[in-house]
Amino acid sequence: MSKTDWNASGPSRPSPSAHWPSGKLWQHGQKYQTTQDRSRPPARRRRQALRVSANHASQQLDQLKAVHLASAVRDLERAMTTLKPWDSPQEISRHQALGYSVIMFMITAVKRLRESKMLTLSWFNQALMVTAPSQEETMNLKTAMWILANLIPRDMLSLTGDLLPSLWGSGLLMLKLQKEERSTSS
């Protein structure tokens, strides 16, 4: 049925039950309004602040830290390569302040960080088992890991596994162990 039903009493007038398009009269040059136009415009939504879940923000922060960690590891690797070009014992004795094996342990750890991005306590314990016969090598390994833990920015340590954050907190203990080592070797 059409909108303008014609009644029998007056074919020129619309039925009162028919709905007119709008409350206003239609004027020449005006567009005919459809029923959709006639209804109220949809309620405008208030602009809402963009809500980012805490988990998403945390992931983005971790990604940013991972990028910075990769950069720090590259810098450490470059620094280690400048310390490593020793082929003769005379060159090694020049850099005895840090110790050749300490630097070699640091190079190994930095390579592992670059490749797997993790230094775990299980890896450290395996390395300690290998160096267990030599007290000096064990101390050098611990010193190397402690130095590495202090070279990497603290807010990125959590991304490196569980070894370096635990060593970072034990800084005073490490200094005490180094002093004891020096006093026993003298």
Curated annotation (Swiss-Prot):
Compartment(s): Host nucleus; Host cytoplasmic vesicle
Keywords: Host cytoplasmic vesicle, Host nucleus
Pfam families given in the database record: Paramyxo_NS_C
GO cellular component assignments: host cell cytoplasmic vesicle; host cell nucleus
Skewed-composition ranges (Polar residues): 1-12
Covalent S-S links between cysteines: none
Location (main, coarse): host cell
Residue numbers spanned by region Disordered: 1-43
Function as written in the Swiss-Prot or TrEMBL entry: Ribonucleocapsid-associated protein that interacts with the phosphoprotein (P), thereby increasing replication accuracy and processivity of the polymerase complex.
Assembly and binders: Interacts with the phosphoprotein (via C-terminus); this interaction allows C to associate with the ribonucleocapsid.
Similarity remark: Belongs to the morbillivirus protein C family.
Name this polypeptide is given: Protein C
Species this protein is from: Measles virus (strain IP-3-Ca)
